[in-house]
Amino acid sequence: IPKEVRDKDAVSRFLESVDQFERILNDSVFIRLERLTTDEIVGTPQQAGLIEKYFSLSQQDTTTLKDIQMSASEMRIGDDILCVHTLSDVDDLPGSVQTDTRYEKYSTDRSDCRLSFAAPVGLMLSCDHIYNQFLFIDDSAEILQRFEKTARNMHSLSKYSRANQLNKQWIDAYLDEAHSFGLTAIRCHCNVMAWSDNREKLKVIKNDTGSALALMGCKPRYNTIDAPALYWAGIPGGEGDFPSEESFFTFIEQGVCFFTEETNYADSLSPFGIKMADRTNGKPLHLDISDEPMRRGITTNRNK
């Protein structure tokens, strides 16, 4: 158990930071952050919790306990075989990232349909999968000092290899960005865990996941060796066991671009509305396009 967990002051400061973060997001109106209760995390005798659903790869409230099998070539949970793709190296990333991109299928000459940068591996990926996003905020000053030392070593070894000189230039560029704009150095990792109980279907899922990552401009990396460790680190509360070698250094601004903000549509709570359909899967929805948008501050006028 980390010593910080036993420190009441450290726990209190952590909870205060979480509460402040929650208020900031909830004040934006468009994004709502809700803290899970203990029962929602670990479950009750009548209803499965988040951890139990994760271990069984199921969204059902009544889940089935499944055996977890690990081997050198694959990982199985019950009958399901895991297929893991990772973004853990800067060489696998595009030259630039952004918070949102234009989705051509639903855009016109006069209007844009904007989706998050990572939308292709979110709801747009039509298979059973989990998209995990990790941001590790360590001591930024210590990280930058470590890079300064590495840059000096690379400079000393530059006469032996041109690669060392190029690495020093990349490190200097990273340090210049950090010091010029006051950016916070962090570690980031993203992975897509897909699964199927059919090996033939799993091959299709593997290709679809690789294509989705390619749409983001990323190089798909199929990971079999670290799948068990990454699955364990994805347990709610298990991020402390994340394998550090699977992360890459970046800044907060670039790291959050790999978040996916889309979610499935939900019925409006209003007693009246119109029937529409989810564009992704055709699910019928009850939608209030009149009063509810005004209550939420999305629009200030309406025509009835």
Segments from the language model and where they lie:
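Glycine-rich phosphate-binding loop of nucleotide-binding enzymes
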Residues: 269-304
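Extended, folded cores of ATP/NTP-driven motor/assembly subunits in large transport
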Residues: 1-263
